[in-house]
Swiss-Prot record:
PANTHER family: NAD(P)H-QUINONE OXIDOREDUCTASE SUBUNIT I, CHLOROPLASTIC. Disulfide bonds: none annotated. This is NAD(P)H-quinone oxidoreductase subunit I, chloroplastic. Belongs to the complex I 23 kDa subunit family. [4Fe-4S] cluster 2 binds at C74, C104, C107, C110.
Length: 166
């Protein structure tokens, strides 16, 4: 065939392909138009965290048997467990337990492998301070129950559920 005709056919095919790609992008843009906004006004509005959210660790002093499994499974050997061996009953007595949240990577291994379930993850994620030494929580600070976002009447909660397509 003539070279001019083949160039014209290639040009037509490329034009159709480009129009199809532009149309696909436009359809994706239009499909996002009916979704809820992601932006929230943070201090006054908060998202309700998911059930398996890994926030601050909660510690129950009475349940801990000082087995140090949490220290062994932690990738950075973070929890500090101080205990004393009671010779008359041959058991460990927990003296002090602390976690530095400035170093913690919130992997959840300590919670998952604890044999007595004395550790649990909370939905609390606001741990920012001006002094990094305030992020070192002892057993008293770890034992404090967090205030649920849903129970706080001063904050508007936003439930961000994925869309269910029917």
């Amino acid at each position: 065939m003539f070279p001019m005709v083949t160039e014209f056919m290639n040009y037509g095919q490329q034009t159709v392909r480009a129009a199809r790609y532009i149309g696909q992008g436009f359809m994706i843009t239009l499909s996002h138009a009916n979704r809820l906004p992601v932006t929230i006004q943070y201090p006054y509005e908060k998202l309700i965290t998911s059930e398996r959210f890994r926030g601050r660790i909660h510690f129950e002093f009475d349940k801990c048997i000082a087995c140090e499994v949490c220290v062994r499974v932690c990738p950075i050997d973070l929890p500090v467990v101080d205990w004393k061996l009671e010779t008359d009953i041959r058991k460990k007595r927990l003296l002090n337990y602390s976690i530095d949240f400035g170093i913690c990577i919130f992997c959840g291994n300590c919670v998952e492998y604890c044999p007595t379930n004395c550790l649990s993850m909370t939905e609390e994620y606001e741990l920012s301070t001006y002094d990094r030494h305030e992020l070192n929580y002892n057993q008293i600070a770890l034992g404090r129950l967090p205030m649920s976002v849903i129970d706080d009447y001063t904050i508007r909660t936003i439930l961000n559920l994925p869309e269910i397509k029917t």
